[in-house]
UniProtKB/Swiss-Prot annotation:
<dbReference type="GO" id="GO:0046872">
    <property type="term" value="F:metal ion binding"/>
</dbReference>
<dbReference type="InterPro" id="IPR019772">
    <property type="entry name" value="Ferrochelatase_AS"/>
</dbReference>
<keyword id="KW-0350">Heme biosynthesis</keyword>
<keyword id="KW-0627">Porphyrin biosynthesis</keyword>
<dbReference type="InterPro" id="IPR001015">
    <property type="entry name" value="Ferrochelatase"/>
</dbReference>
<keyword id="KW-0408">Iron</keyword>
<feature type="binding site">
    <location>
        <position position="169"/>
    </location>
    <ligand>
        <name>Fe(2+)</name>
    </ligand>
</feature>
<dbReference type="GO" id="GO:0006783">
    <property type="term" value="P:heme biosynthetic process"/>
</dbReference>
<dbReference type="InterPro" id="IPR033644">
    <property type="entry name" value="Ferrochelatase_C"/>
</dbReference>
<feature type="binding site">
    <location>
        <position position="118"/>
    </location>
    <ligand>
        <name>Fe-coproporphyrin III</name>
    </ligand>
</feature>
<comment type="similarity">
    <text>Belongs to the ferrochelatase family.</text>
</comment>
<dbReference type="InterPro" id="IPR033659">
    <property type="entry name" value="Ferrochelatase_N"/>
</dbReference>
<keyword id="KW-0456">Lyase</keyword>
<comment type="pathway">
    <text>Porphyrin-containing compound metabolism; protoheme biosynthesis.</text>
</comment>
<keyword id="KW-0479">Metal-binding</keyword>
<protein>
    <recommendedName>
        <fullName>Coproporphyrin III ferrochelatase</fullName>
        <ecNumber>4.99.1.9</ecNumber>
    </recommendedName>
</protein>
<feature type="binding site">
    <location>
        <position position="29"/>
    </location>
    <ligand>
        <name>Fe-coproporphyrin III</name>
    </ligand>
</feature>
Amino acid sequence: MKKAILMMTFGSPEEIIFEGVADFFTNIRRGVRPQDHEIQTLYDNYVRIGGTPLQKITRQEVALVEARLGSEYSVYFANKFSSPFIPDVIGQMEADGIEQCICLILEPHYSFYSVMGYEKFLESKQIQFLVIKDWYQEEALLNYWADEIAKILKEEVKQDSFKVIFSAHSVPIFALDFGDPYIDQIFENSKLVAEKLGLSSEQYTNTWQSESDIGIPWIKPDVLEYLREQTEHPDHYIFVPISFISEHIEVLFDNDVECYDLCQEFGVNYHRPPMPNTDSRLIDALVNTVRVNENQEFKEFLPEEETFDELVPSDETKNILAESQDLQMPEFVKKLIEKKGRENVKMPYLIKKMLEKAGKLPKE
């Protein structure tokens, strides 16, 4: 039986030109082109950081994992929102005669909001899939973060005051209200690293970053808001974007530009440990994740059964809708409905109710 590993990541623009960024942004918005001023802002951010190394780094990670696993598995690489797209790579896997595939998403934590977006593309009449849900507890990855933070504390901070700020990509608040495990996983991940470093609860905190402006509430505190709200600052802030493993715009701009600029404004030293990228400790974590999971059951994947629409909303979610009269329906969702029709659009409960409230959908 021919087996494969499919390593997947978010993707990035294929060219750092306006239309290249527009194409990528349109894919993120499910085929609805954002407004030009939104595209311009994202394009300017990419230009500010000199482009993105994400695709190069990810391909190197894939090659290193493949070399470690040997001939036992064929290793493939796909993106969610840029080429090579997941459905195209699955088509190539079918042509290569693959029958079983372990899906390794290059995001250590599991979220309905993000990881489920990969799962919906896993369709094949030939291939059975095994999706690794999360791998943030891998000891090699925990040691990586602890070791790199320890270097900063020893070589840069020394005896000065400091705070370690663990940050993770934010998710809409409705994901939490559906029982999304992501938030608890981030807190646990941060605590595990902090314990390895011997940090007290006063020496570290959790924040969120990189939320999208789509008119719905996100998990707080946002890292920039957190910095602005502090009445006193330590000598050093150490930013640890723990939900990511590779350098890309949400680290190189959101942390290294926006957080750095605020630190400059407040007279605080900015630090960020290097991302794992192709470090051997990350490769150890990825390979061990495969080994730990490879004997689990493979199955024909049914992504239509793995959507938000299948999840039962909590009373808390309904209360958010009732109490948030100022919620605005995301513009891209309105455009998507108009373009594809309601019957062809899967959406979370909260957004569905927002559409009904706006008179765009018949009430259930």
